[in-house]
Design a protein with these regions (language model features):
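Single conserved hydrophobic/aromatic residue that forms the stacking wall/gate
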Residues: 1-15
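TRNA-recognition modules of translation machinery and tRNA-sensing kinases, especially anticodon-binding
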Residues: 12-162
């Protein structure tokens, strides 16, 4: 069951993340950061998973990062939040290393800004989904947003045939 699935802590840390990458003009960097972060938050909330956002302090940022948010989902089993995604703005640091430039007639050549967002880490999303939609009878509630992909069913019911 879910307890056995979650108990194998390796599942939480499987690295099969789905990243969103943006290369943009410096003046669009803040707007893209907000969009990327909101994509992750909206995805989890659409599945009835409570999330919060932690802004990483400058001392915790990796070398190239200018700004970073961690998105955390609530774990009813552990009674705490755990990280399910991360959104980072690297400013022009990564573009400088990779020599990614923008050509502009007005401003000449300048370095682009790069951003990345771990929008989905499937194992961690599965844990958050199951824990937050598990019912007392052992069934799993299907959030409204997923029902059209599930043939309209609103619950997954355990099979009692053993």
């Amino acid at each position: 069951g879910i307890r056995d699935l979650v108990r194998s802590r390796g599942l939480e840390m499987c690295i099969r993340d789905r990243e969103m990458i943006v290369v943009c003009k410096p003046e669009d960097s803040a707007m893209w950061f907000d969009k990327l972060w909101q994509n992750t938050v909206d995805l989890f909330r659409s599945m009835d998973i409570p999330v919060r956002t932690i802004e990483c302090c400058s001392g915790d940022l990796a070398d190239l990062k200018v700004k970073s948010y961690d998105v955390e989902a609530w774990s009813p089993r552990q009674k705490k939040y755990f990280e399910v995604g991360s959104c980072s703005n690297l400013g022009d640091a990564q573009a400088r290393r990779l020599k990614i430039r923008v050509k502009s007639k007005d401003k000449g050549n300048y370095f682009a800004h790069t951003l990345n967002n771990t929008v989905v880490a499937p194992p961690r999303m599965l844990i958050a989904f199951l824990e937050n939609n598990l019912c007392a009878d052992g069934s799993v509630k299907i959030p409204e947003v997923l029902r059209k992909y599930m043939g309209g069913i609103d619950r997954i019911v355990p099979n009692d045939n053993k």
